[in-house]
Amino acid sequence: MPTTITNSKRSKSVVRITGNTSTTITMNQLSTNTTTELVSSAEISHVTSSTDGKWTIYRGNDASGEKVLCLFGENEIPLSQFDVTIAGANTTANLYITNSGTDGTLILTLNKTATYTIDPETGFPIV
Protein backbone atom coordinates (compact mmCIF):
# COMPACT_ATOMS: atom_id res chain seq x y z
CA MET A 1 0.00 0.00 0.00
CA PRO A 2 1.12 3.58 -0.56
CA THR A 3 3.63 5.19 1.75
CA THR A 4 4.58 8.84 1.27
CA ILE A 5 7.43 10.54 3.14
CA THR A 6 7.91 14.32 3.05
CA ASN A 7 11.26 15.39 4.46
CA SER A 8 12.48 18.83 5.49
CA LYS A 9 16.19 19.41 5.96
CA ARG A 10 17.06 20.47 9.54
CA SER A 11 13.43 19.94 10.45
CA LYS A 12 10.80 17.21 10.61
CA SER A 13 9.64 14.39 8.39
CA VAL A 14 6.00 13.53 7.74
CA VAL A 15 5.10 9.92 6.95
CA ARG A 16 1.69 9.03 5.45
CA ILE A 17 0.69 5.37 5.18
CA THR A 18 -2.63 4.03 3.89
CA GLY A 19 -4.41 0.69 3.79
CA ASN A 20 -3.73 -2.74 5.21
CA THR A 21 0.04 -2.78 5.41
CA SER A 22 3.26 -3.86 7.01
CA THR A 23 6.04 -1.43 6.20
CA THR A 24 9.47 -0.43 7.48
CA ILE A 25 10.64 3.20 7.58
CA THR A 26 14.43 3.44 7.75
CA MET A 27 16.41 6.40 9.08
CA ASN A 28 17.82 6.95 5.55
CA GLN A 29 14.28 7.41 4.22
CA LEU A 30 13.91 10.41 6.56
CA SER A 31 16.83 12.24 4.94
CA THR A 32 16.44 14.92 2.27
CA ASN A 33 19.80 13.82 0.81
CA THR A 34 21.81 10.98 2.32
CA THR A 35 25.04 12.53 1.03
CA THR A 36 24.63 15.73 3.06
CA GLU A 37 22.15 14.76 5.83
CA LEU A 38 22.68 11.62 7.91
CA VAL A 39 19.64 10.94 10.11
CA SER A 40 20.66 9.06 13.24
CA SER A 41 17.39 8.98 15.21
CA ALA A 42 13.70 9.91 15.05
CA GLU A 43 10.89 10.46 17.57
CA ILE A 44 7.14 10.69 16.98
CA SER A 45 5.85 14.19 17.77
CA HIS A 46 2.35 14.12 16.22
CA VAL A 47 -0.02 11.31 15.22
CA THR A 48 -3.21 11.37 13.18
CA SER A 49 -4.85 8.05 12.35
CA SER A 50 -7.99 6.22 11.37
CA THR A 51 -8.50 2.50 10.88
CA ASP A 52 -11.09 -0.25 11.06
CA GLY A 53 -8.44 -2.38 12.76
CA LYS A 54 -5.33 -1.50 14.73
CA TRP A 55 -2.21 0.50 13.80
CA THR A 56 0.86 -0.77 15.63
CA ILE A 57 4.25 0.96 15.57
CA TYR A 58 7.41 -0.89 16.57
CA ARG A 59 11.07 0.17 16.82
CA GLY A 60 13.02 -2.30 14.70
CA ASN A 61 12.69 -4.12 11.38
CA ASP A 62 9.68 -6.29 12.24
CA ALA A 63 7.06 -7.06 14.88
CA SER A 64 9.69 -8.58 17.18
CA GLY A 65 10.92 -5.04 17.92
CA GLU A 66 9.81 -2.83 20.80
CA LYS A 67 6.11 -1.92 20.54
CA VAL A 68 5.85 1.85 21.07
CA LEU A 69 2.28 2.70 20.03
CA CYS A 70 -1.08 1.03 19.28
CA LEU A 71 -3.97 3.00 17.78
CA PHE A 72 -7.63 2.00 17.30
CA GLY A 73 -10.37 3.95 15.50
CA GLU A 74 -9.72 7.66 14.93
CA ASN A 75 -6.95 9.56 16.72
CA GLU A 76 -5.38 13.00 16.80
CA ILE A 77 -2.45 13.14 19.23
CA PRO A 78 -0.52 16.45 19.17
CA LEU A 79 2.37 15.35 21.39
CA SER A 80 4.56 18.32 20.44
CA GLN A 81 2.06 20.73 22.03
CA PHE A 82 3.01 19.22 25.37
CA ASP A 83 6.76 18.94 24.63
CA VAL A 84 6.43 15.15 24.55
CA THR A 85 7.60 12.62 21.97
CA ILE A 86 7.26 8.86 21.61
CA ALA A 87 10.54 7.17 20.85
CA GLY A 88 11.00 3.84 22.56
CA ALA A 89 14.24 2.65 24.12
CA ASN A 90 16.17 2.73 20.84
CA THR A 91 15.60 5.99 18.93
CA THR A 92 18.08 4.90 16.25
CA ALA A 93 16.09 1.80 15.26
CA ASN A 94 13.87 1.78 12.17
CA LEU A 95 10.10 2.13 12.48
CA TYR A 96 8.04 -0.95 11.58
CA ILE A 97 4.35 -0.13 11.10
CA THR A 98 1.37 -2.46 10.64
CA ASN A 99 -2.36 -2.01 10.14
CA SER A 100 -4.51 -5.06 10.91
CA GLY A 101 -7.61 -3.47 9.37
CA THR A 102 -8.73 -3.49 5.76
CA ASP A 103 -8.38 0.27 5.41
CA GLY A 104 -7.07 3.33 7.21
CA THR A 105 -4.61 6.20 7.15
CA LEU A 106 -1.73 6.97 9.49
CA ILE A 107 0.12 10.29 9.46
CA LEU A 108 3.22 10.57 11.65
CA THR A 109 5.26 13.70 12.22
CA LEU A 110 8.79 12.76 13.22
CA ASN A 111 11.40 14.93 14.89
CA LYS A 112 14.79 13.77 13.69
CA THR A 113 18.39 14.09 14.81
CA ALA A 114 20.94 14.34 12.02
CA THR A 115 24.50 15.30 11.20
CA TYR A 116 25.37 17.35 8.13
CA THR A 117 28.29 17.34 5.73
CA ILE A 118 30.48 20.40 6.26
CA ASP A 119 32.22 22.24 3.41
CA PRO A 120 35.94 22.00 4.28
CA GLU A 121 36.68 25.43 2.80
CA THR A 122 33.90 27.46 4.42
CA GLY A 123 33.13 25.38 7.49
CA PHE A 124 29.42 25.72 6.74
CA PRO A 125 27.01 22.81 6.14
CA ILE A 126 26.60 21.84 2.49
CA VAL A 127 23.08 22.60 1.34
Stretches found by the model and what they are:
Residues 15-17, 44-47, 55-57, 95-97, ...:
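Hydrophobic beta-strand residues in large extracellular and virion-surface proteins
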Residues 1-38:
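Transition segment at domain starts
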Residues 67-83:
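Short, solvent-exposed S/T- and G/P-enriched segments that are highly enriched in secreted/extracellular
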Residues 28-55:
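Beta-rich globular "head" domains
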Residues 52-71:
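Short, surface-exposed beta-strand/strand-loop-strand elements in extracellular ectodomains
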Residues 62-64, 82-87, 109-112:
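Long, compositionally biased regulatory regions of eukaryotic proteins
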Residues 1-10, 99-127:
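C-terminal interaction-tip segments
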Residues 83-105:
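Noncatalytic modules at the cell exterior or secretory-pathway interfaces
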